[in-house]
Amino acid sequence: MKFQAIVLASFLVMPYALADDQGGLKQDAAPPPPHAIEDGYRGTDDAKKMTVDFAKTMHDGASVSLRGNLISHKGEDRYVFRDKSGEINVVIPAAVFDGREVQPDQMINISGSLDKKSAPAVVRVTHLQK
């Protein structure tokens, strides 16, 4: 019985005794300064703000995400969206509004796809966030 306890205890301690201490952070060299980092995750530094003018230059079917205001209702599910760079027509089905009301002075985020087949180009909105 004592022999089994000793064998069991040695198996429990063995991984710690044989553990390799080569892993973890190696501090052999100094990290690069923040402005010199070329790769890796940098959070919002990588984010490019999309504008209406930039969205109009994209290809048909491109995914767009814009931040601005709905400034007018053109009938049924058609609206005019404006940000700091310009205006674009958008199509927002009632289901996307989901009962929410949006005022022209409220800043909103819209996401959808660019439809350049219609003239002028429109954004078919699939998500709206107040």
UniProtKB/Swiss-Prot annotation:
Pfam families: BOF. Keywords: Signal. Residues 1-19 form the signal peptide. Residues 24-43 are annotated as: Disordered. GO terms for biological process: cellular response to hydrogen peroxide; single-species biofilm formation on inanimate substrate. The keyword Calcium does not apply. The keyword Zinc does not apply. Gene3D superfamilies: Bacterial OB-fold. PANTHER family: PERIPLASMIC PROTEIN, PROTEIN YGIW. This is Uncharacterized protein YdeI. It comes from Escherichia coli (strain K12). The gene is ydeI.
